[in-house]
Amino acid sequence: LVANNPTPIFRAYSMANHPAEGNMVMLNIRIATPPPKQMQLNPGICSSYVFSLKKGDKITISGPYGEFHINQTNREMIYIGGGAGMAPLRSHIFHLFHTEKTTRKVPNYFVRNGMLAGPPEL
């Protein structure tokens, strides 16, 4: 995403959607706010910009550029992620179950606010 700013600013965000979801781009973005005891700091430039957008606003997106692919195997896969870092994991998991109709075991675990969550066997 490119913020409308006198100086061009670029940020890398991971796509959260998978190809079967159609002609759209889904991103997981957390607005970067200053810590409570450091409110004099500026909020995140790009995340604040994204959260200020309204339906119909135009943005520029390029990519994808990453090399994070699903291994073509029948072995169990374990996904571990946290926060906005769950975006590419969501893409993989939805692709596995909605496109490939996988039957392999794919446990996924995520961390939010320092607490680990996942399947009961964890």
Give names to the regions the model predicted:
Residues 59, 102-122:
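Reductase modules of NAD(P)H-dependent flavoproteins
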Residues 19, 70-72, 100:
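Short, flexible hinge/linker loops that cap or flank conserved catalytic cores
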Residues 76-80:
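Conserved beta-strand elements of the Class I
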Residues 52-59, 67:
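Well-ordered alpha/beta subsegment
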Residues 15, 86-100:
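Histidine-anchored nucleotide/phosphate-binding helix
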Residues 1-55, 112-114:
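Ferredoxin-reductase
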Residues 62-74:
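A short, basic/flexible loop-to-alpha-helix module at the beginning of a structural domain
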Residues 74-75, 95-105:
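Conserved S-adenosyl-L-methionine
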